[in-house]
Amino acid sequence: MRRCRRFVILSLAVAAAVASVGASAHAVLLDSTPKAHGALPAGHTQVVLKYNSKIDQARSRLVLVAPDHSETTLAITADGDKPNELDSTADLKPGNYTLHWQALALDGHLTRGDLPFTVTAAP
Amino acid sequence: MALLVDLFAYLSVILHGLVIVAQSMMLGGLLFLCFLLHPLSSLLPDGGALEQRVLRLTRWSAAGLFLAELAATALQVTALMSTVGLPFSNVMQASFALSGSAKIACALVIALCLNRRTLARPVARTALLLVGFLTLVAATMTTHAFARMDHNALLLVVAGLHQFGAAIWIGGIPSFVLVLRHLHDGQGLAQVGSRFSRMSMLGVACILASGVIMCVFYIGDAQGFYGTAYGVMVSAKIAMFLALLVLGLGNFTVTERLRQGRDAPVLRMRRFAEVEIGIGFTIFFAAASLTSVPPAIDLTSDRVTLHEIAVRNAPAWPRFHSPDHDALAISQLQVQLDREAAHMQMAAPAATVPGSGEPPPRNAQDIAWSEYNHHWAGVFVVLIGLLALLNRAGVGWARHWPLLFLLLAGFLLVRSDPEVWPLGQENWWAAWRDVEVTQHRLFVLLIILFGVFEWSVRTGRLRSERAALVFPLLVAVGGAMLLTHNHQIANVKDQLLVELTHTPLALAGVAAGWSRWLELRLPGRGGRIAGYVWPACFLLIGLILLWYREA
């Protein structure tokens, strides 16, 4: 009887521990410069990611993956007037890039995403 | 990093669900004590002992909140420190860490300071209520409202009202059930019942008013309800809320009869309240899952239309012929990688890396594979429902129906994830890193557990009353799991169309579990009716599975 009760409690604990899953995005990327799968000319470029909710800019991250697969963490400009944006700058050469972003919404939810884009030779 | 963030999201929803349960029970218990039991305790037989029991429950709830919130905050802090590379002192200044710390402190104060002495002193009682209020304020800081771009103040008040309503009603029910269990005096039951009815009505009013406002601001229009994951989850919450209202109405009629001094089915009220706790906690886990998806109003593209839902659900004959494993996208990709590697004379990489965060590739044969799985699962579940009904009608041999669950579990274990052993190349242990594979395996474990328990109970191998309750509890928990289970499908629309089928399955699972609970716990006509309801729910689940389409 006692063993059975312990087993019931254990089963319920296991079941409760898996009772919920949901790894979907919370902060939604509404707009960006560069656009996803878009193209832009080489040179010093402004990077802007605009979300649906306020973002903790100091605790979010932008990592630029260059065509040679090297990774650079971009410095995010804190701007209280644009609380839903992650802004930065980068010097880009022609090739295929991916911007890995991780945003901490002000309500504590972490969201990550990738932004692939192409840099063309400057005209 | 991808695996860490995915695992973080997985665990954080679980912990958030536990936080909501503990928080609601703590606040509900506190309000129950301050506004119901303490004022009535001198009028009730053994009022002091009853108060002591509810005090203990509330203190345990506060301890639970302390631990759950500590774990949730620690997990978030760890995830942030390791992915962004910030020091602990910096991360602890993030708003979620501040509100988490505030909730931990409040829970600790209530766990340590709530006792008969503090409850008896008006100043101390008010201070405890203030600590409860601070908990609620801190909790609203981790809701969608805090991060919204517009209408922050209004939405924060509304979120607070919603949580207050849930606490005073659903969070108060465990205290109510505890009192019902130990109070046998008719007049006392009438007093407690009618006062708790009034508190519940206040809770329902708060939930209803705040819920309507949140629907306006977070969902916006009808398509937001059926066309987005957020809307579908809110619809499921509304369905369960309506079920709670029906049960609450049943209990209200009992308290009214008691108040008028007439005979009333008090045991039914207790059993209904137990079911209310179960459904209420399921709603809390749905709410925890809801906080991890963006509000419907923010999703302007990738919404599902009614036409797409109608096309997807057009009647078609179930698929009982499986495609060949070699025709699946993952197998074909592996063949291609092997060929390329052989050409370059190097080791071939695996077509899929568990836990990489990348959804596996899919083609038409993968869809046929998944539909075949669902349709055969539907056959199993229809048979289970039919045999359970036959058994209910007195056919003796049909009592072995739970063994079908073991066959179903074996079938799912082999076929759910074709990229994993025994059919695929992926190692059994390495596949645990994949969140979806882990969920499937835990579902299988759950099915085995409730199959074994129910068969042992029905064949007399287990005679304990508690053992009989394992089946309904695990079925209800399985329904809750399914409600918040998501599929890793790259196409957002396809993913939602799958969720649209799984949500009614989950609700039928929750209904099946709790009606079987009532059959076991409620003697008389109510229990007999419930005895026919749950096999009918299983039949419904089976039919929905047979109807299931992924394209």
Regions inferred by a protein language model and the residue ranges of each:
Chain B
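Polytopic transmembrane helical bundles with strong interfacial aromatic enrichment
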Residues: M1-A368, L390-W401, G451, W455-G460, ...
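Alpha-helical membrane segments in multi-pass integral membrane proteins
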Residues: G165-A166, I170, R466-H487, L497-L518, ...
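Alpha-helical transmembrane segments and their helix-helix packing motifs
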Residues: L112, L407-V420, W432, G460-R461, ...
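Helix-loop junctions on the outward
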Residues: A71-F88, V414-V435
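Membrane-helix interface and helix-disruption motif detector
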Residues: F225-G227, I367-E371, A393-A398, L423-L442, ...
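Short, flexible domain-boundary/linker segments around small modular repeats
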Residues: V353-A368, V381, L404-F411, E419-D434, ...
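Short, solvent-exposed interaction modules
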Residues: N427-S456, P504-W514, L518
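Structural signature of hydrophobic alpha-helical transmembrane segments
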Residues: F96-A105, Y372-V379, Q439-L445, L500-L507
